[in-house]
Amino acid sequence: MVRRFALPAAVILALAAGAPGPLSARTSVTVQEALLRAKPAVVLVIAEVSAEVTLDCGGGPTTVTPPVFRETGTGWFVDGRGWIITNGHVVQPAHTPPRWLVNQQAQRAVTTACLAKVLQRQGITPGERPDVEDAVKRRLLDAVLPTTKVKLNPQVSVVISSGARFKAEVKKYSPPVSNEPGVMSGRDLALLLIPGAEFPVLPLADSKVGRIGDPIHILGFPGVVLSHELLNKSASVEASVTNGAVSGFKQDVTNQPVIQTDAPAAWGNSGGPAVDQKGAVLGVLTFVSLAPGPEGSIVQGFNFVIPSDAVREFVKDTEVKIEGKSKFTEAWFRGLREFFTEDWKAAARHFEAADKLVPNLPDVKRILGDARENIKNPPPRPFPWFWVAVWVTLLSGAGYGGQFGLRWHRNRYRIQPSEVIRMLEAGKAPIVLDVRRTEVYEALPLKIPNSVRLAPEELASGVSGLELDTNRPVVAYCT
């Protein structure tokens, strides 16, 4: 009996293990869900430095405002109360403006205010005589720059994916890694704070448990997308995603650990989160690899990430709470969970709550629309092969069980020939009743010694006067 039912039972257990039930749905996260968890918490970081340059081109002091210096990078909410992590080098031009930036703004001002006037006096149109123009420009810079005064107005801003822009305050700063003598080298992290009390947030993963080959996804705002002439303005507020794997564990020039990945990255991705397969931050993109030569193009496949454990260490003496929780995130994660288990109504309720907390996030709007559409027009459900397999297995098991029960009922008093032999060997010879049908008994020469002949007809009509030793077992031979 055990052998007969072993196969159906095993099949049922295997099918049940693969069944789409509440427990399995709650413990697994698809790549799509993981990335949607992360995207709303990723922000564009802008470091801007405007300048007021006072100079004298020969006609008295004048104030010039050269074009604003601007660099962009990526950041992400580590605390839903407005705390953002990015790279130190992303905000460095605005946080600690370097000397070269002061000189650059001064030179731009001199070129803008003075060069055209001098060329005009010499009867030269700008661009007409490049060689003469370059010589005049060099003389002007030598003459005007020493008395030029530059006032810088640095500012760091953050743009969330709804397009809302916030002025950010740098609350903690660690300079970028450097191998130049005399240049301070740090962890290349910066902690920003923007006004507001409710934002998306990303949880931190444990970077120590990462292994080579683990999937990794980099989110950010690469400049090639921000400046793409064929994309509209929405590209500047929605994070792009690249995918790869952990490809190594290295140390930078100051012996600090970094994670190597082959996930593609570009200028503008700096400071962006590198998330794992559950959407938690495994690290922060910090630097890429450049080809040798003056152009120094990026060599993809060799990018590096600051481990999340370094982020924990960086913010431990601040007001940041590393909980990975906010009201928005709770509603957003629940909505995604319900959406991917096809509970469209519950998903829509959570998405609506998330949209009220942080309005107009593109991913929220998009998936809320999908949930509402699925409520109105439910998508076709796949054929329930799982339950068909379960029922077929159960019916097969019932059939096997019925056959076994019938056979057991018929044979419940049957004794095997080996049992008879054991009785004979043990000196407990049974009384053998030969109850074969008459035609079989007469046709076959086999006769059992010392047996008692009893035809089936006699059994049917009732037997009287049959004397048997009641202390001996009785075996009926019918085949």
Where are each of the predicted segments found?
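Flexible, polar/low-complexity N-terminal or interdomain linker segments that lie immediately upstream
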Residues: 380-443
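C-terminal subregion of chymotrypsin/trypsin-like serine protease catalytic domains
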Residues: 88, 92, 99, 105-107, ...
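Flexible, gly/ser-rich surface segments that form the specificity/activation loops bordering the active-site cleft
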Residues: 70, 158-185, 201-259, 266, ...
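N-terminal activation segment of mature serine protease catalytic domains
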Residues: 23-83, 87, 95, 186-190
